[in-house]
Amino acid sequence: MTDNFADLRRQWDDLAEQVRHHRDAYYNHTPEISDAEFDQLFRQLQQLEQEHPELAVPESPTLRVGAPVEQSSFDNVEHLERMLSLDNVFDAAELDDWLQRTPSATYLTELKIDGLSIDLVYRSGRLERAATRGDGRVGEDVTANAKVIEDIPHRLQHSDAYPVPELVEIRGEVFIAVEDFALVNEQRQKEGGKPFANPRNAAAGSLRQKDTEAVRKRRLKMICHGIGASEGFEADTQFDAYKALEAWGLPVSPYTKRVHSAQEVQERVTYWAQHRHDATHEMDGLVIKIDSFAEQRALGSTARAPRWAIAYKYPPEEVTTKLLDIQVGVGRTGRVTPFAVMDPVFVAGSTVEMATLHNQTEVKRKGVLIGDTVVIRKAGEVIPEVLGPVVEKRDGSEREFIFPTLCPACGTRLAPQKEDDADWRCPNSQSCPAQLSSRLTYLAGRGAFDIEALGEKGAEDLIASGVLIDEAQLFNLTEDDLKRTKVYTTKAGALNATGEKLLANLESAKHTDLWRVLVALSIRHVGPTAARALAVRYRSLEALRAADVEDIANTEGVGAIIAQSFAQWFDVPWHRNIVEVWADAGVTMADSEADIPDQVLEGLTIVVTGSLVDFSRDSAKEAIVSRGGKASGSVSKKTSYVVVGENAGSKETKARDLGLRILNEDEFKQLLANGTV
């Protein structure tokens, strides 16, 4: 029994970590797998929790909405009312099951726009604030950028039929229309930028631009799909609310339709499956809502989604095209990945000409030959996937792909990292230009140093011109260094505006949080979550390096694999040199005492269960860990306190049975402030 539970727990941990990783990647606009593959992982985790409820913990990703808000130049703001997600169904039988569980006289069907969620607050008819979804409770303040989107009025229009309320919080989706997407990419390439992979990435990246003039040029649009908090507004149905939004001058979807039976709902699903490219924007499903607000209130919500709405997700689209060649790319960690070069083909809202093939084992398994007609699919992900060949279309001219033995970027002999590893890597990690370029763009990202002027082309130019041989000298770059490049100089050879911006960015990046420095080092498995935990516990890189592997592994949220990876990274001399040179250049390697809360919870184990008003699961955990406490997912005799929110469930019952101290949210805040209640 115990061994079986341990196996199940390991299975849950693995699935949960994959879901967390890929969800964070999606919301940070760097997806690594398709939407369909993510949905499959998510459902496997849900099913495991349903079959074994003892595995579920409050911080499970199945209970989360969105992703944590990363620290950035945008201020964090709390939504007046939580922005929930939607549960999904994937076939007619699942939808019919939902319809039987939630019968209603009237449903509203609307397209699921593949864009970026936004929350608008109007007070006395004036736009007061605009924010991204974030984790559903806290988002980023993007008011300045929202004000340059033509679809978002600065002031609501007067309406006799629907008087403008004193306060109204409006939910919508920001997107780029399909026909505008090509124009945006064309302009971006003229300016020397890399084209966006799809309209969603373009919209998400644009809304988080620091330059409002750049946002204005991106042709962003918005459609409203709901109302959050309000004062002085009443409506009986969702449909009436949409009429009010329209009367106030806000855009609503022209594709929304009221239907009055389960059969009509299924008919709408079938219709849009056949006409998904008729919409002016990308869509990946149909949302079905109960129209009556009274019925919505009666059904309520789970921790992550309303019970009165569901999203029907369409399967990935599949098309055929010609496989012209198979080439390989080298990533940040040296992994060599084959990819397909194809005749351009339009699929799922954009034209694609490259698709992933993962590794040489996958190429053989799929049986594709250069020259084949191949089936590809794409469901909103950055790079589509080759499914396999259309064998009956072969004419004998096709040829087998031979995986290279040498790195295409530096000529080093390739090898698997370990025996039987499907992935082959270039071991020349320090000097391989492809790996260095990827590391430079990674450390320049928003989740690390946030060096806006260091993009892919800039990184490649710094390497090709001989200015950088590895990342160690990055913070020692001078104006004379940049004058040796093309990206950062004028035709006359003087430093251009981008070059000046890079020097300013680098100076600013020296004074950043320790966790961002840890992420920037490209240590395998060390992402923002682990980096934050290590920074909170050790406070300085010196203290972290002095700790042994076992001690690091005992850090909440870290574990043995990350600890071992950290130790192995510092075993490499040129890795240590990076840290030393950065420190000499003035990069902060420790968090100041002022940034670190008093360790008032040291030695305490705290369990948080149920939904809190002012804390998400992650922010409650971070509040505990940052004060020296241990945030646990299970209740035991060793638990010091159990913090109980709404819908707490079995953990509260167990805590009472064990006679543990139970705190409400106000008492939890007191505990965080003083260490006692």
Swiss-Prot record:
Region (Disordered): 189-210
Enzyme class name: ligase
Cofactor dependency: Mg(2+); Mn(2+)
Endoplasmic reticulum found in the keyword field: no
Catalytic activity: NAD(+) + (deoxyribonucleotide)n-3'-hydroxyl + 5'-phospho-(deoxyribonucleotide)m = (deoxyribonucleotide)n+m + AMP + beta-nicotinamide D-nucleotide
Keywords: DNA damage, DNA repair, DNA replication, Ligase, Magnesium, Manganese, Metal-binding, NAD, Zinc
Biological-process GO terms, alphabetical: DNA repair; DNA replication
Family, as annotated: Belongs to the NAD-dependent DNA ligase family. LigA subfamily.
Record-given protein name: DNA ligase
